[in-house]
């Protein structure tokens, strides 16, 4: 099972695309161990969608929607001025939700 990761980067944040892609890739590595349980299900669908938008005050708005074989994990935050903090918080939230199961 290979997780499907979808990045939706608003035109307002397009100039940060490389950084967003790198941060999401790094963060996926941190939740990889928690996603391994879905390897046992060959028909499992693991889809993680990350949406990033830059606000007019130079802060960022981000969403993480994960569908892990029917289990939903949702995270949304506004007003993060550091893009890395926003993405790391989103994946930390997902990791905590997975660890609790």
Segments (PLM) and residue ranges:
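N-terminal, polar/charged subdomain of small-to-medium soluble alpha/beta proteins
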Residues: 1-101
């Amino acid at each position: 099972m290979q997780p499907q990761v979808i990045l939706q980067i608003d035109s307002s944040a397009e100039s940060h695309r490389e950084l967003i892609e790198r941060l999401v890739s790094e963060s996926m590595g941190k939740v990889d161990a928690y996603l391994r349980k879905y390897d046992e299900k060959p028909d499992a669908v693991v889809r993680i969608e990350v949406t990033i938008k830059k606000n007019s005050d130079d802060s960022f708005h981000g969403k993480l929607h994960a569908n892990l074989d029917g289990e939903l994990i949702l995270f949304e935050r506004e007003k993060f001025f550091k893009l890395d903090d926003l993405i790391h918080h989103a994946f930390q939230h997902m990791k905590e939700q997975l660890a609790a199961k």
